[in-house]
């Protein structure tokens, strides 16, 4: 083969390769971020959540069927206030039974839902939910036994925001969709038509394409100043080490059920499955900046990853932030200070140990059994739980809350203590769990792996609180 033919052959191979790449890797312009609709429960206004299929374009101009709420992919953002009584109306318009959970919400199990309250097709449920806890970012989603991974993956997930007087009066960005931006992260695997593909029998699920609010690598125009990002990891098995592509520092201000006592300056944050974090980034100066997963990649890195099925994301861009306009007059660092969690419970009623076997989806050498209660707790009590695992993993608990006493033998500093309901740890962790709400034998709370594939396969336990 002479040089010209060899060159032509090489160019043909590259052209063929590039034609197969996702459009977001090649597009000169990205799509603007879609902000989920906001539903507020004020003056007794009910919150309607219809579980149903929808038609959307995940890639290109190809309409595909997905699941979600109220005719859209994923769910609207529900925003409530401490002291509210929320009239919540679920309606299951899907051809499958679905159990719903609001991860992080603190209330009794008969109101929260969970695996003990499954909605059959065309069935509704209307609990009145008292909002008693402080400000938090929660997560409503499917928790159906043995089907939660698939149903979440199809789109049964949304953000639930709780505000209180303290959070509303704090000097923090609070204009929804403007400088207070919700981001729901998912990793998907799509066929050529843009439909979701799911591998049911795998121990974990890792999609090769990263979506935020149902879009791949979008952008958002924002005014100059401090921007607040509320990040929810709604992926099945993937955790996300997040940073900015220019490696700038930012402020971590909240996790799961509340604010840190004071903001923590970081350059990266790891967000496990089901976990919610809130960060502040300073966009007073400079140009565009992208929130990414892991390290910044070159275009050739992206091409290489596209042709290697190694579980990595082909594009690791979460969102590009494009600041515009004049420098904000109020460009100083936001200052706030919230009440510490943090009188840790002084009386520990009981200590328990749980070992997670990720390979076999077991807790303490047992798989989930709906007839077995794994934890009987006293309402109002605190317990110390020691968690260990064969591999790094995510943990979650329903209807209760905890503070992380230590992780991998490193004690949590007092200024980082915050109420949580999810946790990512490498080997071991000690948590102090507070049980403030009741759960019956017929409608228990659950705990276990936050990897929904693992939970569906048996890494799940039941809690009764009386």
Curated annotation (Swiss-Prot):
The Gene Ontology biological process annotation of the record reads:
FtsZ-dependent cytokinesis
The lineage's top-level taxon is Bacteria
What keywords are assigned to this protein?
Cell cycle, Cell division, Periplasm, Signal
Give the molecular function GO annotations.
Answer: copper ion binding
How far does the signal peptide extend, from start to end residue? 1-28
Could you tell me which Gene3D superfamilies the record lists for this protein?
Cupredoxins - blue copper proteins (2.60.40.420)
Q: Name one GO cellular component term.
A: cell division site
Q: Does the keyword field hold Transport?
A: no
What's a Pfam family in this record? Cu-oxidase_3
Where found, per UniProt? Periplasm
Concerning PTM, the database record says:
Predicted to be exported by the Tat system. The position of the signal peptide cleavage has not been experimentally proven.
State what this protein does: Cell division protein that is required for growth during stress conditions. May be involved in protecting or stabilizing the divisomal assembly under conditions of stress.
Family (UniProt): Belongs to the FtsP family.
The protein here is known as Cell division protein FtsP
Q: Which gene encodes it?
A: ftsP
